[in-house]
């Protein structure tokens, strides 16, 4: 039986402001707050909310039959928290249906997987934590930025404990093979690979409203007929795209949402189901490995990383940024970490591309690739100065890591000692309380025949309940222990 894996990416660009050379060293805030607020509210109104409402309607109408997956970048979630929290609330409502899966991805939507394994792992783990906080479940399948993948990256992902990964079904990688099977990483068979069907995905995300396209207009029944016509043994149809395709790339006036709403019933009529990535990874066996020695992605015709690293400007900016990756990770300064996440976002390098593209590229405030490069390098110059100012630059990374590890261990040891002190203080006060209680009872037993003498002892007993005061003093210490 054929099954469709429908997945949407949600990522929001954090726009950098115009930053001059003379701002270096004086201005440490790099972001265009007005543009960030304007752009995310526009995309939420035109795309995210209408699309998510449509997907919710599809789930409610079709029950457990219809399923969908999402991934959100950490920086995208931060922008949504600030400017469009209703999007996250809607995603939580969708999550409550039990028909939605959330995938892992790098926190920054950056390119760390290409150059720094430790930074890549740290980003993925932080994003998993954030997803779990919002949606109550830790991701088991990973989707890298722009579906970037290679054998080495796949091996790293498998070693992190993920069972599956999404990537591009590029022709130059697959050759005669079909993307409609489950494959596995060539270096680590534990990691299953789900490959995007390029044509079926782009029919919706890129061509749907193009009246010059041979397949225009595209109807849901014809779309499902294409899927049903695949050979019986081709069971997995992976349709991956950005959520902004529904409403931005393909305007709502094109009836894109009506098309989407019709898909579940058309699939059901043809015996085609919907599954989440983890369900497919658990239920369907791999038919073999896919060899990807060189990095691929879902961007541009080449399906590689040349959109971010294709010219000298991009490579210079990339190498300079990641030259301080280990130092940033070791220092672990909150403000530095936040700026690090935003500066890593792959969009910053995409704005510098000189490649022609079939997909329009909005460079925002930048008039040219060189303009984007100059502005970014000014910001990066200030950022690296701040990183180096945290600790002396003559201390190398190994020495710094050793020093900070020692400090961290000492802090943990002090914390343990503090907890032990609180515990012992509480124990001492408990012993004192019991001793005073026993002491208060002794006068009553000493003169049983003389009732008059016994009375003062009885009256004094309440006055001797000093432990009540001590108990109130002990309570803050008990709280400190917790």
Label for each model-derived stretch:
Residues 426, 430-482:
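Intrinsically disordered, polybasic Lys/Arg-rich low-complexity tracts
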Residues 52-56, 88-92, 121-131, 154, ...:
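Generic structural signal for well-ordered alpha-helices
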Residues 119-146, 225-240:
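CE4/NodB-like, metal-dependent polysaccharide N-deacetylase domain
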Residues 9-13, 73-75, 107-110, 136, ...:
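An acidic- and aromatic-residue-enriched active-site/binding cleft used to recognize and process polar
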Residues 3-8, 14-116, 140-143, 163-168, ...:
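Short, well-structured secondary-structure segments
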Residues 2-46, 181-182, 187-191, 210-213, ...:
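Active-site and substrate-binding clefts of carbohydrate-active enzymes
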Residues 163-229:
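Loop-rich catalytic cores of soluble enzymes, especially ATP-dependent carboxylate-amine ligases
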Residues 87-104, 125, 137, 158-179, ...:
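Acidic, His- and aromatic-enriched active-site or binding-groove loops in soluble protein domains
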